[in-house]
Swiss-Prot record:
Residues noted as binding Mg(2+) in the record, renumbered to the chain: E441, D469
Recorded family membership: Belongs to the malate synthase family. GlcB subfamily.
Protein name: Malate synthase G
Enzyme class: transferase
Species this protein is from: Mycobacteroides abscessus (strain ATCC 19977 / DSM 44196 / CCUG 20993 / CIP 104536 / JCM 13569 / NCTC 13031 / TMC 1543 / L948) (Mycobacterium abscessus)
Pathway entry: Carbohydrate metabolism; glyoxylate cycle; (S)-malate from isocitrate: step 2/2
């Protein structure tokens, strides 16, 4: 990129400089010249420290690799291994007990347990849908998914034709009544028997027939209503475990007319928080890509992001939802609730650089430092409302919420805290305005989690287990120890069970309850919602105040779990427990015996992973899609991002390193699976098949490189190869 602006010691891409100066800075109160001088100072000062931290990662990995190679024929001695990790500084002393001091945090983080969406910031439509997913129709979520089986005449009708299957609709209504019975039980009888609702002297009454009415078992669960009493269209607002439920009443509507109580929908407070992602779910490899993400982030914070959407043959403009206003039960006051999810922004980690900013010698500067500066500047608009900042606020407490991924240990968390402090100085923000969400997704952070939290104890607003990346790091860290177990077995290994408990226990021990989120990972099968409803309740039962979901519909369905589980009570019960032992966390997931694998087992593992890798990489390289719903080898749609890619590529790289498989077998597996992926993408007009010209297909070559060179990638990360290959593709396409 030749069109650059000199900023002190730096050279900034013109597209970025113009966007920040002309679009992002106005309305923030930050002087443009002072800001760019601050950028120059922060980047110049902190880039060398960033590089030192990456060198420390490499040095530790080299020492761990050497230790395992020297003991290749010996059984692993757990005590000696732990001593070694302590000696080299991989394990650090655990700090004395402490309590985090994070202040000025929104209720969505401190007190309300509920689902958390993660969405790629480069896609404006996805970002708008996610921000608006604070409230979701339970009827739509049930009708449109497999939670209601398509049996006994309950098949879905086509939304495009306006069809509606009343048999299925009746099952949806019955399911929703069961939800109400569990979340807001009546003093007598069941919501299933309701034939009407009314408000009398500030109390909600539910008519059950024969002129009999009953109230709620807990009358305080009725907190508001909309509409005018006595009119046909109105709604009732309930609350349970801090989450709201709106019962919409309209006996003249198509659905309400089939309901004996006139209820047309039950709307659940769903995605309480949403992470707008600049990291694993996006493919941003240059200044133009970054500016696209920054511009969408600006639109979200100013409240003016919009997108033309076509649905059911109609086109409309999607915008951010307004707040929701209810009348209090006594009819005298108002209750205003947020209409949108509280937004976090996930910056990239410490590893990657980006050509948006280079130094005088042309060296790219750390992308994580750039993200911290620019996403924080933009988020100032979300702290204010007015003519220059837009009508909507994000935080009501004056905080900016940044998720920082892929940090290795306390010293990297401390560096992030230092970076955030420097950014606050540049922007003129009070200390600790920038809050941090710590992803517990790297092994060195897991085993030193208490110290990592303490390193940002006045900023931390969440810790979250990211078991996908964490598995990738588990494999790479112990690459030389021996062949790892198969991917499907990994979730039942001792380390991962201890990891999930350890995260909750450490968070509670550091006083996160009531101050910060304790989160758990993603449901990766977006079409299998019945399975999610059956299984994901385990996360709040384990003490998680939030957990990741792949779609607004999934957020609405996962919200059911927080009505069923009182997470505050669970956390009170778990407080003070230490269920996970360090020995378990350090248990390497080696295969019990490679000799138990048949040739068919090995081929199946090769094919499964090659198909997963190709299915994700081809869209990343060719289309710049960072998060895909990729069919697996059995055509089950799975959410894939760089974390799942890291696992698949690292597992095959590990097996290659230990001669479980050969390079030829890997290449043959990729060539077998490429036509499968081509077939699965046949309906995509923009898709370019990989077969049969494998040698000239950049995506195919990237997938091969990720496996064959996997053991030499920094911590097993896929970004360096993906970014280089995507740039190669973009350059070729531009010719």
């Amino acid at each position: 990129m030749s069109d650059r602006v000199d900023v002190g010691n730096l050279r900034v891409a013109r597209v970025l400089y113009d966007f920040i100066t002309n679009e992002a800075l106005p309305g923030t109160g930050v002087d443009a010249d002072a800001f760019w001088a601050g950028v120059d100072k922060v980047v110049t000062d902190l880039a060398p420290r960033n590089r030192e931290l990456l060198e420390r990662r490499d040095d530790l990995q080299t020492q761990v690799d050497r230790w395992h190679r020297q003991r290749a024929i010996e059984p692993l001695d757990g005590a000696a291994y732990q001593d070694f990790l302590t000696e080299i500084g991989y394990l650090v002393p655990e700090p004395e007990d402490f309590t985090i001091t994070t202040a000025n945090v929104d209720d969505e983080i401190t007190t309300t347990a509920g689902p958390q969406l993660v969405v790629p910031i480069l896609n404006a439509r996805f970002a708008l849908n996610a921000a608006n997913a604070r409230w979701g129709s339970l009827y739509d979520a049930l009708y449109g998914t497999d939670v209601i089986p398509e049996a006994d005449g309950a098949e879905k009708a086509s939304a495009d034709t306006g069809g509606y299957n009343k048999v299925r609709g009746d099952k949806v209504i019955a399911y929703a009544r069961e939800v109400l019975d569990g979340a807001a039980p009546l003093a007598s009888g069941s919501w299933k028997d309701a034939v009407g609702l009314k408000i009398d002297d500030g109390q909600l009454l539910v008519e059950l027939g024969d002129e009999f009415s009953t109230g709620l078992q807990n009358p305080d669960q009725f907190v508001g209503y909309t509409g005018k009493l006595g009119k046909p269209q109105w709604s009732v607002l309930l609350i349970n475990h801090g989450l709201h439920i709106e019962v919409l009443i309209d006996p003249d509507s198509p659905i309400g007319s089939t309901d004996k109580a006139g209820i047309k929908d039950v709307v659940l407070e769903s995605a309480i928080t949403t992470i707008m992602d600049f990291e694993d779910s996006v493919a941003a490899v240059d200044a133009e890509d970054k500016v696209l993400g920054y511009r969408n982030w600006l639109g979200l914070n100013k409240g003016d992001l919009s997108e033309e959407v076509s649905k059911g043959g109609k086109t409309f403009t999607r915008v951010l939802n307004e707040d929701r206003v209810f009348t209090t039960p006594d009819g005298k006051g108002e209750l205003t609730l947020p209409g949108r999810s509280l937004l976090f922004v996930r910056n990239v980690g410490h590893l990657m650089t980006n050509d948006a900013i280079v130094d005088a010698a042309g060296n790219e500067m750390p992308e994580g430092i750039q993200d911290a500066l620019f996403t924080s500047l933009i988020a100032i608009h979300g702290l204010r409302s007015g003519k220059k900042n837009g009508p909507l606020k994000n935080s009501r407490t004056g905080s900016i919420y940044i998720v920082k991924p892929k940090m290795h240990g306390p010293e990297e968390v401390a560096f992030t805290a230092e970076l955030f402090g420097r950014v606050e100085e540049v922007l003129g923000l009070p200390h600790a305005t920038l809050k941090v969400g710590i992803m517990d997704e790297e092994r060195r952070t897991t085993v030193n989690l208490k110290a990592a939290i303490k390193a940002a104890s006045d900023r931390v607003v969440f810790i979250n287990t990211g078991f996908l990346d964490r598995t990738g790091d588990e494999i790479h860290t112990s690459m030389e120890a021996g062949p790892m177990c198969r991917k499907a077995v990994m979730k039942s290994q001792p380390w991962i069970l201890a990891y999930e408990d350890h995260n909750v226990d450490t968070g509670l021990g550091a006083g996160l309850a009531g101050k910060a989120q304790i989160g758990k990972g993603m449901w990766a099968m977006p079409d299998l919602m019945a399975d999610m409803v059956a299984q994901k309740i385990a996360q709040p039962r384990a003490g998680a105040t939030t957990a990741w979901v792949p779609s607004p519909t999934a957020a609405t369905l996962h919200a059911l779990h927080y009505h069923q589980v009182d997470v505050k009570a669970v956390d009170q019960e778990l407080a003070g427990k230490h269920r996970a032992k360090l020995e378990s966390l350090l248990t390497i997931p080696l295969a019990e015996s490679r000799h138990d694998w048949t040739a068919e087992d090995i081929r199946e593992e090769i094919d499964n992973n090659c198909q997963s890798i190709l299915g994700y990489v081809v869209r990343w390289i060719d289309q710049g899609v960072g998060c895909s719903k990729v069919p697996d080898i059995h055509d089950v749609a799975l959410m894939e991002d760089r974390a799942t890619l890291r696992i698949s590529s690292q597992l095959l790289a590990n097996w290659l390193r230990h001669d479980v498989i050969t390079e030829d077998e890997v290449v043959e597996g990729l060539k077998r699976m490429a036509p499968v992926v081509d077939r699965q993408n046949a309906g995509d007009k923009e898709y370019r098949p990989m077969a049969p010209d494998f040698d000239s297909n950049i995506a195919f070559q990237a997938a091969k490189e990720l496996i064959l060179e996997g053991k030499d990638q920094p911590n097993g990360y896929t970004e360096p190869i993906l970014h280089r290959r995507r740039r190669e593709y973009k350059a070729a396409a531009a010719k």
